[in-house]
């Protein structure tokens, strides 16, 4: 879990406003991504299912409570004039916070693990161990979609390393990639 400061939240008319987000980097629950139709131009159906698993709602509520405690502690407490959401946060029970998390959880837009990598005999594996697509010559994938699990941190650094590794493999073994 992490606590993120969001300086761009609520800045329509009040530049002194900021937000704090409680972030659950690893979830027990999972969503689903499905094709809406055979038409490649139709947007896929995305079902996030945030906090559907009670363990996720409980953990995110705990992080939310920690975020609130952070706001009320030390130097930051003297700078906070008002908390706009949730109203009256000190009086919310753990159950109330979990319900709040279920209703208002959203994505940080770091999807990963959507393209399976595996052995040639795995019918669900789209990519081989080099990142080459089994069904389209000349296509390699080098991003967060090939991660087998969601990392417990922001996906940026991990994605950069995947790109570096596949880029180096391309340089050293170009024939493997059809070059």
Identify the residue ranges that each predicted region occupies.
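FAD-dependent oxidoreductase catalytic-site/capping-region signature
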Residues: 1-158, 166-179
